[in-house]
Amino acid sequence: MTKKEENTDLKKKVENGKIVSPVLPKGVKNYLIDIDGTIGDDIPNEEPDRMVTAKHYPDALKTINNWYDEGHIICFFTSRVESHRKVTQDWLNKHGFKFHSLLMGKPRGGNYHWIDNHLVKATKYNGKFTDLIEKEVKIEVFDDTDN
């Protein structure tokens, strides 16, 4: 069940007198969620016939749909290739996942490090999909001290 992102939700942002990329309203999150091995069985691109019958994870379905209903943006970001878009959309819809968009072609192999000018948070899926909790962890950042 896809729903177009409404541009009216985005808030204009100005820095140093110039308009920059807009931001979501306070409290609204952009969830970027993997598919294979995260919300359902881990199926490689080399075996697309298995994508149709892959099992979904009920806890992921419940949590993601709750986030959607709370007004957060749900985007599935997968390493599946563009030719697998239809089977992927059909599978998401068949299992009742609510989402706004689907991005194909995420690099394969893991060990991701996302660099962005907006706040980025990452959560590694370890077999249990629940609401998120706060936890202090060690992270890698750019050295922004003046030399």
Predicted regions located by residue number:
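HAD-like aspartate-dependent phosphatase fold
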Residues: 1-147
